[in-house]
């Protein structure tokens, strides 16, 4: 199902969007995140998790700046460097599960429930 439609149909309390940029450099990451934002992927988001990456920064843009450039105007919390994606420890998230994210003193916890 298309993500914006899923959020409207199934996520009454908001949608937690989680992504990672894998091996993409900062400019590619910014471009892809802008495209997702313009396509409506974050319209019903209540928060965004971005997985940690080993991908390179660009000469004039870091990975963090890429996320801020593309998503900084969203009025939702954005957590960077989450332990999800292609960088160890590869913590799994379950698509469609309910989730609660807390961040205290730079330490984040994601709690998921099924059903």
Task: Name each region found by the language model.
Residues 1-33:
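ATP/pyrophosphate-binding catalytic subdomain of soluble kinases
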Residues 9-11, 41-42, 71-72, 92-93:
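Solvent-exposed alpha-helices and their adjacent loops that cap or buttress functional pockets
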Residues 27-41, 63:
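A short, acidic, amphipathic alpha-helical segment used as a generic capping/interface helix at domain edges
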Residues 52-115:
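ATP/nucleoside-binding phosphotransfer catalytic cores, i.e., glycine-rich phosphate-binding loops
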